[in-house]
Protein backbone atom coordinates (compact mmCIF):
# COMPACT_ATOMS: atom_id res chain seq x y z
CA UNK A 1 0.00 0.00 0.00
CA UNK A 2 2.91 2.34 0.69
CA UNK A 3 4.04 1.89 -2.92
CA UNK A 4 0.58 2.99 -4.09
CA UNK A 5 0.87 6.33 -2.32
CA UNK A 6 1.51 9.32 -4.55
CA UNK A 7 5.16 10.21 -4.92
CA UNK A 8 6.02 12.78 -2.32
CA UNK A 9 2.88 12.14 -0.25
CA UNK A 10 4.58 11.90 3.12
CA UNK A 11 1.27 11.90 4.98
CA UNK A 12 0.02 8.91 3.00
CA UNK A 13 3.23 6.98 3.60
CA UNK A 14 3.14 7.63 7.34
CA UNK A 15 -0.51 6.62 7.50
CA UNK A 16 0.14 3.28 5.80
CA UNK A 17 3.32 2.68 7.75
CA UNK A 18 1.53 3.43 11.01
CA UNK A 19 -1.19 0.93 10.13
CA UNK A 20 1.41 -1.73 9.42
CA UNK A 21 3.16 -0.96 12.71
CA UNK A 22 -0.14 -1.41 14.53
CA UNK A 23 -0.80 -4.82 12.97
CA UNK A 24 2.69 -6.01 13.88
CA UNK A 25 2.42 -4.62 17.40
CA UNK A 26 -0.95 -6.31 17.86
CA UNK A 27 0.47 -9.67 16.76
CA UNK A 28 3.46 -9.36 19.06
CA UNK A 29 1.21 -8.31 21.93
CA UNK A 30 -0.69 -11.55 21.50
CA UNK A 31 2.32 -13.78 20.84
CA UNK A 32 4.50 -12.53 23.70
CA UNK A 33 1.65 -12.88 26.18
CA UNK A 34 0.79 -16.33 24.89
CA UNK A 35 4.32 -17.70 24.43
CA UNK A 36 6.68 -15.30 26.22
CA UNK A 37 10.04 -14.82 24.48
CA UNK A 38 9.73 -15.38 20.71
CA UNK A 39 11.75 -14.56 17.58
CA UNK A 40 11.47 -10.95 16.43
CA UNK A 41 10.91 -10.38 12.71
CA UNK A 42 11.04 -6.76 11.53
CA UNK A 43 11.65 -7.16 7.80
CA UNK A 44 9.50 -8.69 5.09
CA UNK A 45 10.47 -12.27 4.26
CA UNK A 46 10.59 -13.24 0.59
CA UNK A 47 12.14 -16.70 0.98
CA UNK A 48 12.22 -19.48 3.58
CA UNK A 49 14.11 -18.65 6.78
CA UNK A 50 15.39 -21.33 9.18
CA UNK A 51 17.80 -19.38 11.39
CA UNK A 52 15.55 -17.72 13.95
CA UNK A 53 16.67 -16.96 17.48
CA UNK A 54 14.47 -16.15 20.45
CA UNK A 55 14.26 -12.49 21.52
CA UNK A 56 13.24 -11.28 24.97
CA UNK A 57 9.64 -10.20 25.22
CA UNK A 58 10.69 -7.12 27.19
CA UNK A 59 12.86 -5.77 24.35
CA UNK A 60 10.12 -6.58 21.84
CA UNK A 61 7.67 -4.53 23.89
CA UNK A 62 9.97 -1.49 23.81
CA UNK A 63 10.20 -1.70 20.03
CA UNK A 64 6.42 -2.04 19.70
CA UNK A 65 5.88 0.99 21.94
CA UNK A 66 8.13 3.08 19.72
CA UNK A 67 6.25 1.92 16.63
CA UNK A 68 2.83 2.53 18.17
CA UNK A 69 3.78 6.04 19.28
CA UNK A 70 4.54 6.76 15.63
CA UNK A 71 1.29 5.11 14.53
CA UNK A 72 -0.81 7.01 17.08
CA UNK A 73 0.54 10.25 15.66
CA UNK A 74 -0.02 9.51 11.98
CA UNK A 75 -2.92 7.06 11.52
CA UNK A 76 -6.24 8.87 10.83
CA UNK A 77 -9.28 8.89 13.09
CA UNK A 78 -12.06 6.34 12.60
CA UNK A 79 -14.34 8.86 10.90
CA UNK A 80 -11.77 9.30 8.12
CA UNK A 81 -11.09 5.66 7.21
CA UNK A 82 -13.08 2.75 5.85
CA UNK A 83 -14.52 0.10 8.16
CA UNK A 84 -11.95 -2.46 9.18
CA UNK A 85 -8.97 -0.16 8.68
CA UNK A 86 -6.64 0.71 11.54
CA UNK A 87 -7.69 3.85 13.42
CA UNK A 88 -5.86 6.37 15.56
CA UNK A 89 -7.89 5.32 18.60
CA UNK A 90 -7.01 1.65 18.06
CA UNK A 91 -3.31 2.56 18.01
CA UNK A 92 -3.66 4.51 21.25
CA UNK A 93 -5.73 1.75 22.85
CA UNK A 94 -3.08 -0.89 22.13
CA UNK A 95 -0.35 1.51 23.18
CA UNK A 96 -2.10 1.88 26.54
CA UNK A 97 -1.81 -1.88 27.08
CA UNK A 98 1.90 -1.75 26.33
CA UNK A 99 2.32 1.23 28.67
CA UNK A 100 0.63 -0.79 31.42
CA UNK A 101 3.04 -3.68 30.79
CA UNK A 102 5.93 -1.27 31.26
CA UNK A 103 4.50 0.19 34.46
CA UNK A 104 3.99 3.55 32.74
CA UNK A 105 0.63 4.09 34.40
CA UNK A 106 0.48 7.87 33.93
CA UNK A 107 1.12 7.43 30.21
CA UNK A 108 -1.65 4.83 30.06
CA UNK A 109 -4.03 7.28 31.74
CA UNK A 110 -2.99 10.06 29.37
CA UNK A 111 -3.43 8.04 26.18
CA UNK A 112 -6.78 6.50 27.18
CA UNK A 113 -8.06 9.92 28.22
CA UNK A 114 -7.15 11.23 24.76
CA UNK A 115 -9.44 8.58 23.26
CA UNK A 116 -12.27 9.11 25.74
CA UNK A 117 -12.23 12.91 25.46
CA UNK A 118 -11.17 13.12 21.82
CA UNK A 119 -14.64 13.78 20.45
CA UNK A 120 -14.65 10.94 17.90
CA UNK A 121 -15.70 8.03 20.08
CA UNK A 122 -18.32 7.83 22.81
CA UNK A 123 -20.22 5.06 24.52
CA UNK A 124 -23.48 4.06 22.87
CA UNK A 125 -26.19 4.93 25.38
CA UNK A 126 -29.25 5.42 23.14
CA UNK A 127 -31.14 2.90 21.02
CA UNK A 128 -30.00 2.73 17.38
CA UNK A 129 -29.88 0.58 14.29
CA UNK A 130 -32.03 -2.21 12.93
CA UNK A 131 -33.94 -3.10 16.12
CA UNK A 132 -34.16 0.28 17.81
CA UNK A 133 -37.97 0.23 17.79
CA UNK A 134 -38.19 -3.21 19.45
CA UNK A 135 -39.63 -2.35 22.86
CA UNK A 136 -38.31 -5.48 24.58
CA UNK A 137 -34.69 -4.83 23.58
CA UNK A 138 -32.06 -2.35 24.76
CA UNK A 139 -28.90 -0.58 23.68
CA UNK A 140 -26.72 -3.57 24.56
CA UNK A 141 -28.73 -5.72 22.16
CA UNK A 142 -28.44 -3.02 19.48
CA UNK A 143 -24.67 -2.81 19.80
CA UNK A 144 -24.19 -6.47 18.97
CA UNK A 145 -26.43 -6.85 15.93
CA UNK A 146 -24.07 -7.62 13.09
CA UNK A 147 -25.71 -4.99 10.89
CA UNK A 148 -25.24 -2.32 13.58
CA UNK A 149 -21.59 -2.73 14.52
CA UNK A 150 -20.17 -0.59 11.71
CA UNK A 151 -22.94 2.01 11.47
CA UNK A 152 -21.85 5.67 11.76
CA UNK A 153 -24.09 6.09 14.82
CA UNK A 154 -22.15 3.32 16.56
CA UNK A 155 -19.40 5.53 17.92
CA UNK A 156 -18.04 2.94 20.33
CA UNK A 157 -16.06 0.69 18.02
CA UNK A 158 -12.38 1.58 17.79
CA UNK A 159 -11.47 -1.30 15.49
CA UNK A 160 -13.54 -4.08 13.93
CA UNK A 161 -13.02 -6.97 11.60
CA UNK A 162 -15.38 -6.69 8.63
CA UNK A 163 -16.94 -10.01 7.67
CA UNK A 164 -20.00 -9.88 5.41
CA UNK A 165 -21.96 -12.56 3.63
CA UNK A 166 -20.69 -12.89 0.07
CA UNK A 167 -17.63 -10.72 0.68
CA UNK A 168 -14.46 -11.76 -1.13
CA UNK A 169 -12.36 -13.88 1.19
CA UNK A 170 -15.32 -14.86 3.36
CA UNK A 171 -15.13 -18.52 4.40
CA UNK A 172 -17.18 -20.43 6.94
CA UNK A 173 -18.45 -17.59 9.10
CA UNK A 174 -17.75 -16.88 12.76
CA UNK A 175 -19.16 -20.16 14.12
CA UNK A 176 -19.68 -18.37 17.44
CA UNK A 177 -22.74 -20.40 18.46
CA UNK A 178 -21.04 -23.66 17.52
CA UNK A 179 -18.15 -22.88 19.85
CA UNK A 180 -19.86 -21.05 22.70
CA UNK A 181 -23.28 -22.63 23.20
CA UNK A 182 -23.97 -25.70 25.35
CA UNK A 183 -24.29 -29.02 23.55
CA UNK A 184 -27.97 -29.25 24.46
CA UNK A 185 -28.74 -31.52 21.51
CA UNK A 186 -26.29 -34.29 22.41
CA UNK A 187 -28.36 -37.46 22.21
CA UNK A 188 -29.42 -38.98 25.51
CA UNK A 189 -27.67 -36.47 27.77
CA UNK A 190 -30.55 -34.23 28.89
CA UNK A 191 -33.45 -36.27 30.27
CA UNK A 192 -36.99 -35.37 31.19
CA UNK A 193 -37.98 -35.98 34.83
CA UNK A 194 -39.64 -39.23 33.72
CA UNK A 195 -36.45 -40.46 32.05
CA UNK A 196 -37.03 -39.81 28.34
CA UNK A 197 -34.54 -38.17 25.98
CA UNK A 198 -35.52 -34.53 26.17
CA UNK A 199 -33.68 -32.50 23.55
CA UNK A 200 -33.00 -32.29 19.83
CA UNK A 201 -30.91 -29.81 17.84
CA UNK A 202 -32.22 -31.08 14.51
CA UNK A 203 -33.53 -28.55 12.01
CA UNK A 204 -37.24 -28.03 11.39
CA UNK A 205 -38.46 -29.41 14.70
CA UNK A 206 -41.91 -28.19 15.71
CA UNK A 207 -40.19 -26.40 18.59
CA UNK A 208 -37.28 -24.96 16.64
CA UNK A 209 -34.65 -24.27 19.27
CA UNK A 210 -31.69 -24.63 16.93
CA UNK A 211 -33.08 -22.06 14.49
CA UNK A 212 -33.67 -19.56 17.28
CA UNK A 213 -30.45 -19.86 19.29
CA UNK A 214 -28.02 -21.86 17.14
CA UNK A 215 -26.27 -25.21 17.46
CA UNK A 216 -23.46 -25.48 19.97
CA UNK A 217 -20.96 -28.18 20.87
CA UNK A 218 -19.42 -26.33 23.84
CA UNK A 219 -15.84 -25.83 22.80
CA UNK A 220 -15.77 -22.82 25.12
CA UNK A 221 -17.46 -23.39 28.47
CA UNK A 222 -17.93 -20.61 31.04
CA UNK A 223 -17.21 -21.08 34.71
CA UNK A 224 -19.75 -20.56 37.49
CA UNK A 225 -18.02 -17.21 38.00
CA UNK A 226 -18.87 -16.10 34.45
CA UNK A 227 -22.45 -17.37 34.64
CA UNK A 228 -23.43 -16.42 38.17
CA UNK A 229 -20.66 -15.21 40.45
CA UNK A 230 -19.70 -12.07 38.60
CA UNK A 231 -23.35 -11.02 38.34
CA UNK A 232 -24.06 -11.52 42.05
CA UNK A 233 -23.19 -8.71 44.45
CA UNK A 234 -24.23 -8.79 48.10
CA UNK A 235 -25.94 -12.14 47.42
CA UNK A 236 -28.25 -10.60 44.79
CA UNK A 237 -28.04 -11.71 41.14
CA UNK A 238 -28.57 -8.63 38.97
CA UNK A 239 -30.95 -9.51 36.14
CA UNK A 240 -31.64 -5.83 35.50
CA UNK A 241 -28.12 -5.51 34.08
CA UNK A 242 -28.73 -5.55 30.32
CA UNK A 243 -25.77 -7.90 29.87
CA UNK A 244 -27.39 -10.49 32.14
CA UNK A 245 -31.02 -9.73 31.36
CA UNK A 246 -33.18 -12.83 30.87
CA UNK A 247 -36.65 -11.35 30.35
CA UNK A 248 -35.72 -10.35 26.77
CA UNK A 249 -33.30 -13.24 26.18
CA UNK A 250 -30.16 -11.12 26.18
CA UNK A 251 -28.87 -13.79 28.54
CA UNK A 252 -30.05 -17.37 28.30
CA UNK A 253 -30.24 -20.09 30.93
CA UNK A 254 -30.92 -23.75 30.27
CA UNK A 255 -34.14 -23.49 32.25
CA UNK A 256 -35.45 -21.05 29.63
CA UNK A 257 -35.35 -23.80 27.00
CA UNK A 258 -38.11 -26.41 26.69
CA UNK A 259 -38.05 -30.13 25.98
CA UNK A 260 -38.40 -30.33 22.20
CA UNK A 261 -37.53 -33.89 21.20
CA UNK A 262 -40.23 -34.84 18.63
CA UNK A 263 -40.29 -38.36 20.09
CA UNK A 264 -41.78 -36.92 23.28
CA UNK A 265 -44.81 -35.57 21.43
CA UNK A 266 -45.17 -38.75 19.41
CA UNK A 267 -45.25 -40.85 22.56
CA UNK A 268 -47.56 -38.46 24.40
CA UNK A 269 -44.94 -37.59 27.02
CA UNK A 270 -46.28 -34.90 29.34
CA UNK A 271 -42.93 -33.08 29.41
CA UNK A 272 -42.96 -32.08 25.76
CA UNK A 273 -42.86 -28.26 25.55
CA UNK A 274 -42.20 -27.79 29.28
CA UNK A 275 -39.16 -25.99 30.63
CA UNK A 276 -35.95 -27.90 31.32
CA UNK A 277 -35.06 -28.97 34.85
CA UNK A 278 -31.60 -29.87 36.07
CA UNK A 279 -33.02 -31.97 38.91
CA UNK A 280 -36.14 -34.05 39.31
CA UNK A 281 -38.44 -33.49 42.28
CA UNK A 282 -36.64 -36.40 43.95
CA UNK A 283 -33.26 -34.68 43.53
CA UNK A 284 -31.99 -36.84 40.66
CA UNK A 285 -29.74 -34.94 38.25
CA UNK A 286 -31.22 -34.97 34.75
CA UNK A 287 -28.13 -34.02 32.72
CA UNK A 288 -25.34 -36.57 32.31
CA UNK A 289 -22.73 -33.98 31.27
CA UNK A 290 -23.17 -30.60 32.93
CA UNK A 291 -19.71 -29.50 31.77
CA UNK A 292 -20.59 -29.43 28.08
CA UNK A 293 -24.37 -29.52 28.05
CA UNK A 294 -25.66 -27.25 30.83
CA UNK A 295 -24.74 -23.59 31.31
CA UNK A 296 -25.92 -20.06 30.59
CA UNK A 297 -24.68 -17.82 27.79
CA UNK A 298 -24.95 -14.23 26.44
CA UNK A 299 -27.33 -14.68 23.53
CA UNK A 300 -27.02 -10.99 22.64
CA UNK A 301 -23.37 -11.62 21.73
CA UNK A 302 -23.43 -15.15 20.38
CA UNK A 303 -26.32 -14.92 17.90
CA UNK A 304 -24.98 -14.56 14.35
CA UNK A 305 -27.46 -15.30 11.52
CA UNK A 306 -26.23 -18.22 9.42
CA UNK A 307 -28.08 -18.29 6.07
CA UNK A 308 -26.14 -21.25 4.65
CA UNK A 309 -26.85 -23.76 7.43
CA UNK A 310 -30.14 -25.31 8.53
CA UNK A 311 -28.51 -25.78 11.94
CA UNK A 312 -27.03 -22.32 12.48
CA UNK A 313 -23.49 -22.32 13.86
CA UNK A 314 -22.73 -18.63 13.39
CA UNK A 315 -22.48 -16.99 10.00
CA UNK A 316 -20.45 -14.01 8.81
CA UNK A 317 -20.60 -10.80 10.79
CA UNK A 318 -18.50 -7.84 11.84
CA UNK A 319 -16.63 -8.37 15.11
CA UNK A 320 -15.26 -5.88 17.63
CA UNK A 321 -11.51 -5.96 18.23
CA UNK A 322 -11.40 -2.88 20.48
CA UNK A 323 -14.33 -0.92 21.97
CA UNK A 324 -14.38 2.28 23.96
CA UNK A 325 -15.84 0.39 26.92
CA UNK A 326 -12.52 -1.42 27.26
CA UNK A 327 -10.68 1.90 27.02
CA UNK A 328 -12.51 3.04 30.15
CA UNK A 329 -11.56 -0.20 31.89
CA UNK A 330 -7.91 0.17 30.87
CA UNK A 331 -7.90 3.62 32.43
CA UNK A 332 -9.60 2.23 35.51
CA UNK A 333 -6.87 -0.39 35.71
CA UNK A 334 -4.15 2.25 35.52
CA UNK A 335 -5.85 4.13 38.37
CA UNK A 336 -5.92 0.90 40.40
CA UNK A 337 -2.17 0.39 39.94
CA UNK A 338 -1.66 3.96 41.17
CA UNK A 339 -4.00 3.52 44.13
CA UNK A 340 -6.46 6.15 42.89
CA UNK A 341 -9.52 4.19 43.95
CA UNK A 342 -12.22 6.82 43.41
CA UNK A 343 -11.17 7.53 39.83
CA UNK A 344 -11.05 3.80 39.11
CA UNK A 345 -14.54 3.38 40.56
CA UNK A 346 -15.88 6.21 38.39
CA UNK A 347 -14.60 4.60 35.20
CA UNK A 348 -15.98 1.19 36.14
CA UNK A 349 -19.32 2.74 37.05
CA UNK A 350 -19.52 4.54 33.70
CA UNK A 351 -19.72 1.12 32.06
CA UNK A 352 -22.12 -0.22 34.69
CA UNK A 353 -24.51 2.72 34.36
CA UNK A 354 -24.77 2.21 30.61
CA UNK A 355 -25.62 -1.46 31.27
CA UNK A 356 -28.33 -0.52 33.82
CA UNK A 357 -26.47 -2.37 36.58
CA UNK A 358 -27.98 -1.75 40.00
CA UNK A 359 -24.86 -1.73 42.17
CA UNK A 360 -22.21 0.96 41.79
CA UNK A 361 -18.68 0.58 43.08
CA UNK A 362 -17.39 2.84 45.83
CA UNK A 363 -13.76 3.80 46.25
CA UNK A 364 -13.68 1.48 49.26
CA UNK A 365 -14.91 -1.41 47.10
CA UNK A 366 -12.12 -0.91 44.59
CA UNK A 367 -9.50 -0.48 47.30
CA UNK A 368 -10.56 -3.82 48.80
CA UNK A 369 -10.86 -5.74 45.52
CA UNK A 370 -8.07 -3.92 43.67
CA UNK A 371 -7.48 -5.45 40.23
CA UNK A 372 -10.31 -7.89 40.94
CA UNK A 373 -12.85 -5.08 40.49
CA UNK A 374 -11.51 -4.35 37.01
CA UNK A 375 -11.29 -8.02 36.07
CA UNK A 376 -14.88 -8.59 37.18
CA UNK A 377 -16.15 -5.74 35.02
CA UNK A 378 -14.06 -6.91 32.09
CA UNK A 379 -15.69 -10.33 32.47
CA UNK A 380 -19.15 -8.76 32.37
CA UNK A 381 -18.54 -6.31 29.54
CA UNK A 382 -16.04 -8.15 27.33
CA UNK A 383 -17.37 -11.72 27.45
CA UNK A 384 -16.27 -13.47 24.24
CA UNK A 385 -14.45 -10.29 23.10
CA UNK A 386 -11.28 -10.00 25.15
CA UNK A 387 -8.51 -12.62 24.93
CA UNK A 388 -8.84 -13.35 28.65
CA UNK A 389 -5.70 -15.48 28.94
CA UNK A 390 -3.62 -12.76 27.32
CA UNK A 391 -4.99 -10.02 29.57
CA UNK A 392 -4.52 -12.09 32.73
CA UNK A 393 -0.93 -12.80 31.69
CA UNK A 394 -0.33 -9.09 31.13
CA UNK A 395 -1.63 -8.31 34.60
CA UNK A 396 0.44 -11.13 36.11
CA UNK A 397 3.57 -9.64 34.54
CA UNK A 398 2.72 -6.18 35.90
CA UNK A 399 2.43 -7.65 39.40
CA UNK A 400 5.77 -9.43 38.97
CA UNK A 401 7.59 -6.40 37.55
CA UNK A 402 6.27 -3.87 40.08
CA UNK A 403 5.95 -5.91 43.28
CA UNK A 404 2.61 -4.20 43.98
CA UNK A 405 0.70 -6.28 46.58
CA UNK A 406 -2.24 -8.26 45.19
CA UNK A 407 -5.73 -8.49 46.70
CA UNK A 408 -4.89 -12.08 47.67
CA UNK A 409 -2.17 -10.86 50.01
CA UNK A 410 0.69 -12.04 47.81
CA UNK A 411 3.48 -10.26 45.99
CA UNK A 412 5.12 -11.69 42.88
CA UNK A 413 8.57 -11.53 41.29
CA UNK A 414 9.88 -11.94 37.75
CA UNK A 415 12.54 -14.48 38.71
CA UNK A 416 9.81 -16.92 39.80
CA UNK A 417 7.23 -16.04 37.14
CA UNK A 418 6.81 -19.61 35.86
CA UNK A 419 6.63 -20.98 39.41
CA UNK A 420 4.38 -18.48 41.18
CA UNK A 421 2.24 -15.94 39.35
CA UNK A 422 -1.08 -14.13 39.43
CA UNK A 423 -2.34 -15.76 36.22
CA UNK A 424 -2.24 -19.20 37.86
CA UNK A 425 -3.64 -18.00 41.18
CA UNK A 426 -6.55 -16.22 39.51
CA UNK A 427 -7.41 -19.17 37.24
CA UNK A 428 -7.40 -21.64 40.12
CA UNK A 429 -9.33 -19.21 42.36
CA UNK A 430 -12.09 -18.57 39.83
CA UNK A 431 -12.33 -21.83 37.89
CA UNK A 432 -14.66 -24.65 38.90
CA UNK A 433 -12.38 -27.23 37.34
CA UNK A 434 -8.61 -26.86 37.56
CA UNK A 435 -6.88 -28.82 40.33
CA UNK A 436 -10.19 -29.47 42.07
CA UNK A 437 -10.53 -33.16 41.20
CA UNK A 438 -13.11 -32.49 38.50
CA UNK A 439 -13.29 -35.26 35.92
CA UNK A 440 -14.86 -35.28 32.46
CA UNK A 441 -17.26 -38.09 31.46
CA UNK A 442 -14.29 -39.56 29.58
CA UNK A 443 -12.05 -39.82 32.63
CA UNK A 444 -9.82 -36.78 32.10
CA UNK A 445 -8.99 -34.44 34.97
CA UNK A 446 -8.69 -30.67 34.65
CA UNK A 447 -5.20 -29.73 35.82
CA UNK A 448 -3.11 -26.58 35.62
CA UNK A 449 0.36 -25.45 36.75
CA UNK A 450 2.02 -22.03 37.14
CA UNK A 451 4.28 -22.59 34.13
CA UNK A 452 1.19 -22.74 31.92
CA UNK A 453 1.24 -18.94 32.05
CA UNK A 454 3.10 -19.41 28.76
CA UNK A 455 2.14 -21.97 26.16
CA UNK A 456 4.71 -24.44 24.83
CA UNK A 457 6.61 -23.39 21.73
CA UNK A 458 5.44 -25.87 19.06
CA UNK A 459 8.03 -28.59 18.46
CA UNK A 460 7.57 -28.30 14.71
CA UNK A 461 8.73 -24.67 14.86
CA UNK A 462 11.80 -25.60 16.91
CA UNK A 463 12.72 -28.62 14.80
CA UNK A 464 12.29 -26.89 11.45
CA UNK A 465 14.57 -24.04 12.55
CA UNK A 466 17.75 -25.90 11.59
CA UNK A 467 20.00 -22.85 11.36
CA UNK A 468 19.15 -21.25 14.70
CA UNK A 469 17.72 -21.94 18.15
CA UNK A 470 14.19 -21.17 19.30
CA UNK A 471 13.95 -21.64 23.05
CA UNK A 472 11.32 -23.79 24.75
CA UNK A 473 9.42 -22.37 27.72
CA UNK A 474 10.12 -23.57 31.24
CA UNK A 475 8.09 -26.56 32.31
CA UNK A 476 8.00 -28.20 28.89
CA UNK A 477 10.37 -30.82 27.42
CA UNK A 478 13.32 -29.39 25.49
CA UNK A 479 14.48 -26.54 27.73
CA UNK A 480 17.90 -28.17 28.08
CA UNK A 481 18.69 -26.91 24.55
CA UNK A 482 17.88 -23.28 25.39
CA UNK A 483 20.43 -20.49 25.04
CA UNK A 484 20.23 -16.91 26.37
CA UNK A 485 17.67 -15.01 24.26
CA UNK A 486 18.61 -12.03 22.14
CA UNK A 487 17.91 -8.52 23.37
CA UNK A 488 16.70 -6.14 20.69
CA UNK A 489 18.55 -2.87 21.22
CA UNK A 490 16.97 -0.66 18.60
CA UNK A 491 17.18 0.24 14.95
Residue ranges and their predicted role:
Residues 99-271:
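An aromatic- and glycine-enriched ligand-binding surface/loop that stacks and positions planar moieties
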Residues 215-352:
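C-terminal substrate/ligand-recognition segments
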Amino acid sequence: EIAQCLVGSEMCIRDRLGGAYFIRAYRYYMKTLQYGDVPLVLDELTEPKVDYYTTTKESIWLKMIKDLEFAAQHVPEANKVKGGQVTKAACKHLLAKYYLLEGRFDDAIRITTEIINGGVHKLCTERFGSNKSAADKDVIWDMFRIENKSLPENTEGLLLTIDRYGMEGNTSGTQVMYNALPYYGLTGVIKTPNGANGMSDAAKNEIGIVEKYGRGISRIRPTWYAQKGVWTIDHVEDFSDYRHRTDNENWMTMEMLVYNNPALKKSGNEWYGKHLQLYSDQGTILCKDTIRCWYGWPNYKTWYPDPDRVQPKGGPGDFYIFRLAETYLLRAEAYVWKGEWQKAAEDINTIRKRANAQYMYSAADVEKQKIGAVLDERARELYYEEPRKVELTRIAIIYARTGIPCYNGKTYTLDRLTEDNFWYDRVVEISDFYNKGVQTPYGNYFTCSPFHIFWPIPSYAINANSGGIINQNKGYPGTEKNIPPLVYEGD
